[in-house]
Amino acid sequence: MATSTISAPSSVRNVILTGFMGTGKSSVGRLLAHRLGFRYCDLDALIVEGEGVSINEIFARHGEPHFRALETEAVRSVSREERCVVSTGGGAVISPENRCLLRKAGVVVNLTATVEEVCRRLREETDRPLLKDDRSGERIAAMMAEREQFYADAELRIDTTGKSVEDVVAEITGYLEGR
């Protein structure tokens, strides 16, 4: 697999990665940004940096509504950027305002994976506040189903199940080159 930088079409201002937790947004985003010669921006990392505490701590201290408000502020900020690959948090697309801003900001790519794959990928992770009390496949499936209508709003959808990060990046760059 070639690792050289490719040129994104000039019509591609940003690439926005959406998807449920554990679908590969961060891993794919970092490599995709490198391949495109874009900057990489992780919304959750921006929030943590701005607040000075972890996502878990934000949820524990202030609750999900406060976190979602911070997330919308971060979306507003990155939507003004150019030549950036943005990895959103899994729930960022729940907000109609966020979906609108993200669509205007660039090409929205939704990464998916099977429930089983997400469970496998998240098995050892402890920084997922919405799964802290229930990490079951049933809980994950229910959350994925609740969000499906919002994820489906993407320009491109890629199932990452069983694929390497490189393969997913190649699918995205192939799409962008043909756009």
Curated annotation (Swiss-Prot):
PROSITE patterns: SHIKIMATE_KINASE
Chief place where the protein resides: cytoplasm
Family annotation (InterPro entries): P-loop_NTPase (IPR027417), Shikimate/glucono_kinase (IPR031322), Shikimate_kinase/TSH1 (IPR000623), Shikimate_kinase_CS (IPR023000)
GO cellular component: cytosol
Subcellular localization, as worded in the UniProt entry: Cytoplasm
UniProt-listed Enzyme Commission number(s): 2.7.1.71
Pathway annotation from the record: Metabolic intermediate biosynthesis; chorismate biosynthesis; chorismate from D-erythrose 4-phosphate and phosphoenolpyruvate: step 5/7
Binding locations of substrate: D44, R68, G90, R147
Keyword Metal-binding: yes
Catalytic activity: shikimate + ATP = 3-phosphoshikimate + ADP + H(+)
Entry-linked PANTHER family: SHIKIMATE KINASE, SHIKIMATE KINASE 1, CHLOROPLASTIC
Family of the protein in this entry: Belongs to the shikimate kinase family.
Protein name: Shikimate kinase
Lineage of source species: Bacteria, Pseudomonadati, Thermodesulfobacteriota, Desulfuromonadia, Geobacterales
